[in-house]
């Protein structure tokens, strides 16, 4: 649509992967929820687009997350998970799209 001003904030809260081989750097995981809520609340207050973006950037700079799983997921269209987790292990730092983590712990 023409005439609609937009801005973009790339959320990068995942502390497990500072330079992911699957992306251009830190990825957004659970922290995206808080950035969305803060930006939405600011917009609901009637803030300008620039003020909404600034609030989202401040939140993004201060939110950190790390993933943990006891099982791997199977992505749609695939027959098996991208990694496995034994019954006595947990996977730390995996991605939300099935990317393997950085460490397994017993």
Question: What label would you give each PLM region?
Answer:
Residues 17, 43-106:
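Mixed-charge interfacial surface used for oligomerization/domain docking
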Residues 1, 5-53, 58-65:
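Active-site histidine-anchored catalytic micro-motif
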